[in-house]
Amino acid sequence: IFKPLDMDDSYLMFYHDEPDDILGVYIDGVDYRDKNALSMDWSGGGIVTTMDDLLTFMMALENGNFLSDEVYRQMTDSKERYDKGIYYGMGMMYFDFSEISSLLGSMTDVYGGMGATGVYMLYDQENDTYFIANYGSLGFAEKSIEELIKIRMIFDRIEI
């Protein structure tokens, strides 16, 4: 996946010849980046990456040159409820902001990937806008969505 998309700054944790100087991954205030204990995140991919590469990956998913239409539909068909206003499917999550709070009813929905350490790559199809962030801490998974809502509220006020 990395080579065809020219994601030169992405690799699998612990399977890289020369580990780069990566940001810390914090769990209860302890930095786990140099410990061989991050196998807990293999369901999230165990990938070290940059926000630029996350954007490259999300754009590749959206432009239709990376997956078949059928697989893309399966990935974006988020039927299972994760939490209020948050749904998931085959590798993707969908955020219905009007369901999260009636005060967010005018905010367009987004979908994409979200990790346990507060990292996300999300796409607003209606506005053709990508939202990418990485908070690097297990304690920021929920906080990252709160911050996304704040960012979206500012972004939605900007006239382009």
Specify the residue positions occupied by each region the protein language model found.
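Short, gly/Ser/Thr-rich active-site loops of penicillin-recognizing serine hydrolases
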Residues: 78, 97-100, 140-160
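Short, surface-exposed loop or secondary-structure junction motifs
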Residues: 1-110
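Short acidic/glycine-enriched loop/turn segments that link adjacent beta-strands
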Residues: 18-19, 115-117
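Alpha-helix termini
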Residues: 19, 128-131, 141, 145
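Residues at secondary-structure transition points
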Residues: 51-52, 97, 118-124, 142
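Short, surface-exposed beta-strand/loop micro-motifs that present aromatic residues
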Residues: 110, 117-130
